[in-house]
């Protein structure tokens, strides 16, 4: 600090760090996550607000092409050209440069408006010798976000509009911080994809009663690829979590949640996954009236209902059986009751 005479709070930094991460704690989801090795200046005074900008360089050196893909493309080496070689598992190094700029200001009493943008520039390391040819070049990724925090006597609320453009727009419930190398190699070209994400989440407290909520919606399109590749998707999620404080260290809490996700493919087909949950828990923590208080011990029972056949339970039934790679036989179920204990701590 104290590097600039016109801005005493400005900080110049260099090194490895988590940088201005934004998280929806109810979903345990970081919707803005830029991190790694880099440098920058943050909280510089500019007009009525604060300006921050940073540069990061991330290396994805464990990225590899699956062996079966060698039958679909050509594997190139500097001293020769191989075709259809199933015995080779090609690897390459992709360095992603990330340029982040952010400006925040007090929009009115009790409110904070934040404007942020990030440019992701992927670069293939030519010194690694091996790469898959005849594949689309990775395009740049872009993230733009506008968020508004409101703080009031009963609690707080955050509203976000986020736009993601390019190969970092591949998945719902994503944050745009990574380039979707895998899908690009597998034929699902997301270079021209774009995604909108809308979030609203917060908490309030009235006496011994508290309440938290999370609302999320996303829609994306512009994907290209094979007939079975994704063309577009959309998803919606809503969660409410009321609680009642029993003592200084205990409370009863409930949680109701719903999600739906629809994916449309290039061949016109589509599929939808959706589910609901209901949880009731007895909770112990040092300050039961504060939802951030940790460590927190929960004794809970949860009811789940879903049409997602990935939610499988072991069954001796041979009807509609699913055989896993290890030979275990499962039968799909659309509902389940789970109970147990859970300990959560933050540090």
Name what the model sees in each region.
Residues 1-8, 18-31, 64-66, 70-90, ...:
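Surface-exposed loop and membrane-interface regions of Gram-negative outer-membrane beta-barrel proteins
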Residues 1-71, 94-116, 301-309:
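Outer membrane beta-barrel
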Residues 13-15, 214, 241, 253-255, ...:
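Outer-envelope exported proteins of Gram-negative bacteria
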Residues 30-34, 93, 232, 272-278, ...:
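Phosphate/oxyanion-binding active-site loops and adjacent basic polyanion-contact surfaces
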Residues 90-92, 104-106, 230, 330-332:
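Tandem-repeat/low-complexity and Cys-motif detector
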Residues 99-267, 272-280, 284:
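Detector for outer-membrane/organellar transmembrane beta-barrel domains
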Residues 269-328:
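C-terminal structured domain segments
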Residues 280, 284-286, 330-347:
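Outer-membrane beta-barrel "beta-signal"
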């Amino acid at each position: 600090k104290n590097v600039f005479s016109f801005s005493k709070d400005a900080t110049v930094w260099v090194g490895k760090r988590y940088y201005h991460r934004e998280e929806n704690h109810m979903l345990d989801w970081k919707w803005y996550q830029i991190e790694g090795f880099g440098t920058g200046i943050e909280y510089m005074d500019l007009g009525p607000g604060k300006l921050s900008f940073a540069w990061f360089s991330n290396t994805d050196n464990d990225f590899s092409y699956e062996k079966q893909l060698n039958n679909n493309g050509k594997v190139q080496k500097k001293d020769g050209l191989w075709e259809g070689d199933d015995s080779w598992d090609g690897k390459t190094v992709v360095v992603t440069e990330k340029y982040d700029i952010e400006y925040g200001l007090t929009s009115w009493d009790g409110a904070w408006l934040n404007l942020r943008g990030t440019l992701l520039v992927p670069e293939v390391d030519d010194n690694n010798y091996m790469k898959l040819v005849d594949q689309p070049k990775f395009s740049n990724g872009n993230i733009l976000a506008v968020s508004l925090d409101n703080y009031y006597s009963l609690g707080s609320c955050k509203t976000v509009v986020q736009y993601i453009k390019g190969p970092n727009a591949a998945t719902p419930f994503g944050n745009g911080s990574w380039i979707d190398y895998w899908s690009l190699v597998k034929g699902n070209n997301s270079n021209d994809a774009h995604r909108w994400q809308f979030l609203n989440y917060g908490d309030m407290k009235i006496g011994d009663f508290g309440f938290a909520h999370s609302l999320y919606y996303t829609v994306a399109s512009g994907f290209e690829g094979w007939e079975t590749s994704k063309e577009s998707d959309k998803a919606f999620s809503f969660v409410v979590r009321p609680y009642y404080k029993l003592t200084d260290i205990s409370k009863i809490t409930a949680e109701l949640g719903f999600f739906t996700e629809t994916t449309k493919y290039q061949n016109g087909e589509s599929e939808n996954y959706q589910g609901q949950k209901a949880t009731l828990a007895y909770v112990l923590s040092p300050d039961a009236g504060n939802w951030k208080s940790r460590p927190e011990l929960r004794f809970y029972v949860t009811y789940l209902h879903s049409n997602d056949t990935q939610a499988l339970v072991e069954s001796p039934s041979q009807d509609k059986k699913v055989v896993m790679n290890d030979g275990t036989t499962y039968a799909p179920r659309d509902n389940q009751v789970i109970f147990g204990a859970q300990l959560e701590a933050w540090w």
